[in-house]
Amino acid sequence: MEKLFERLGTENNLFNSFVSREEMELYSAIQELIRDVTDGDIKKIEIQISKVEKLTVNISGLEHQCLLFAKGELVKQRDKDQNKAMELMMKAIHITLPDFDGINPLRSNLLTFDEIMIINSIAVLHAKNGKVMDAIQLEMWLKDYMEDKIVDGKMKTAKYPMILYNLSNWFGIKGCHHEAFQMADLGVDFCVSYGNLAAFPILVSNKGVALAELGEFEEARKYLHQTITVFEAMKKTDRAQAVIDWCSMHYNIKF
């Protein structure tokens, strides 16, 4: 039922009312595992994978999809093994999308949030392996899907800005700075409307970088200064300093 609601583009708020204690324990463990993966805490990911594995011994299907995804992220982050990570991600996505080849979008399919998360990770792996156009193709699919099919909700608020952030980065790598600016600008507007503070400063930064690459240094300086101010307000002084150093080194913009 939960996945049906997701494919219809909404969140299932009835889920907690109709599950057993064991199902709720597994659901909570999987949600915690997803949070650990998002935070990139390798030790917590290892511990939570072990916990979920014990809870899924006699269960087949969708729960193993998330487990394979988490193992793929662990291999990518801890072991830096991109090939093994891709193998695990493809095993995960093939549980529900057996026809997906890892490159070509399946635009007629409805997607769950887990599938969006896995496809995004596959795109990131393509980019890390130098296949930036493959990454852009997949991420544009997810962008369009989230805009057209998914109504407002917590998962959209969390995931959609990061998809735009990735696209902004990858368009920049390919020298498509107008497109990089457009993706970052769209992400900033979304963050302001829906309150995603975590993604906001990095998207503002990408706006500034894209403008600098286009030679619009005064406008670039404005957005990069905003980025530094927000990072400092969030007490992320290391991130603020990284922006300051980057601006000085690459664009001779001093703060």
Segments from the language model and where they lie:
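Structural motif corresponding to the intra-repeat A-B loop/turn of tetratricopeptide repeats
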Residues: 8, 39, 78-79, 129, ...
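Amphipathic alpha-helical segments of tetratricopeptide repeats
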Residues: 49-57, 90-102, 140-151, 185-196, ...
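Structural signature of alpha-solenoid helical repeat junctions
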Residues: 25, 63, 107-117, 152-159, ...
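"A position-specific structural signal for the A-helix of alpha-solenoid helical repeats
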Residues: 31-32, 63-71, 114-121, 159, ...
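Short C-terminal boundary/hinge segments that cap the last helix of small helical domains
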Residues: 8-26
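DNA major-groove recognition helix of helix-turn-helix/homeodomain DNA-binding modules
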Residues: 1-14, 254-255
